[in-house]
Each structure stands twice: as C-alpha cells, then as structure tokens.
From Swiss-Prot:
The gene is rplB. GO terms for biological process: cytoplasmic translation. This is Large ribosomal subunit protein uL2. It comes from Deinococcus radiodurans (strain ATCC 13939 / DSM 20539 / JCM 16871 / CCUG 27074 / LMG 4051 / NBRC 15346 / NCIMB 9279 / VKM B-1422 / R1). Residues 255-275 have a biased composition (Basic residues). GO terms for molecular function: RNA binding; rRNA binding; structural constituent of ribosome; transferase activity. Residues 1-20, 214-275 are annotated as: Disordered.
Amino acid sequence: MAVKKYRPYTPSRRQMTTADFSGLTKKRPEKALTEALPKTGGRNNRGRITSRFIGGGHKRLYRIIDFKRRDKSGVNAKVAAIEYDPNRSARIALLHYADGEKRYILAPEGLTVGATVNAGPEAEPKLGNALPLRFVPVGAVVHALELVPGKGAQLARSAGTSVQVQGKESDYVIVRLPSGELRRVHSECYATIGAVGNAEHKNIVLGKAGRSRWLGRKPHQRGSAMNPVDHPHGGGEGRTGAGRVPVTPWGKPTKGLKTRRKRKTSDRFIVTRRK
C-alpha cells in the first residue's frame, strides 16, 4: 500500500494524505460475515458518558474476524480477497475453506489472493498460517498472538505491528512485543506467521477536523479552556497554567503517572518491562 498525496488546492488538502487502496480486491463485504454495529456515543447502558469525545461518524458494518482458528486445524483455506475494514487499521483477508466455510482473518503483509493458508500444530511456519508458539522457530515474526490458550488473539493486531519469538523455556516462549517488552507466553498459545499488513497506515495525515468527525471522534477539549466547575485546570483570566500537577477532570494525576497495579498477577510473565 502506498500513501496518496494531493495538490494543495485548499488549505486542508495541503497536508492531507490517504491510502491508495491499491491492494484491495473486493469492495463489498461478505454479507454472512457482517453484523450491525450500533453507535454508543460513548455512553454506557445507563446513558452516561463513560468515554468522552466519541460520537457521530460514518455508519459501519462490523466484520466478524476469526481470532482463534483452532477449530479449522488441518483444513486448507484459499485467500479469496483482501478487503478494507472500517473498524480497524489493518486490512482483512477473506478465506474460502476446503469444507465450504468462509471466514475473515487479519491480512498479514505480503499475503496475496490465491495463496493457501492453514492452521494447527501440523501447519508449516509460513506466511498466514496459525500454529502454537512451540512450533514457531526462534527469530520468527508473528502477529495475532494469544495470551491465554484458546481465548483468541489479543496482541499485535494493528496495522504494521508484529511480535518476535526470542527464545523458549519449558512450557513458555519468550517474545518481544511492539512496546519492547520481553514477555513469557504459554507455548500452547496460537500466533499467525508474519507481520500485520498496511504498515503505511501510520503515515496517514487527516489534514482537517472533518476527517476526524467522519471517524466518530469529537473535538478533545482542553481542561485549561474550561471553567473551574468543569475541570481542575479551568478558570483564570486569560491563559493561565494549571497551577498544580496535571490531573484528569476527576482530580486523578495523569500525564506520565504509572497506572499499572502493583503486584499484578501477570508480573511474573514479564522478563523486561517496556521502555
């Protein structure tokens, strides 16, 4: 995928870039693999805002992605299409299995239409195949990594991300995460060979506020621009500092404060903390 630039015939076009979508092979999603995605506006089931600055945006269909792939062990699948997914930064691949079933997976970098992929302990460690970590060679790059066997992929799912296998010890495999963290993951956890595709996504420049609104993002209001009743940083004549350590609207310290719980159960799996 390449990044497309524009002539500056308006101020917003000067900086704006888009994906050229050249790698896509299908426009409409597979109807049986989609479902409605109602908008929340950042509200919970009581109608209260639990996530600020969310609302509006283009209507979307949710594409049902197979993050497990365990139940298709030993069944060959052919890549029928590479598609756009509005719900994530990565592209998705439509698989046609030999038993007649169709499923979506995250499209790794380099996967093409017509390629054959497989899953399971007997699968070869080649691009697009999903297999337990104990069968992945040291040094290999993987994505869609499980943290709990059978739970489904949780790590390295965004565009361009990957995890590298660093070593193996008894029932665990040491992997390097995109954050730089070295972590032990159970060897029965599944991962897919290769890095997630659409790596150029990080170079996209929105260029104007309207494109953020199309994505369902509302303007992020600064606390210092509010009144004292609305935020601890608010008030004052003209532009004034917060006058205290940066805090959230609810008075909790923020901007650099570590929020990870002390003595968390998963601490024993972390070999080296993220940088």
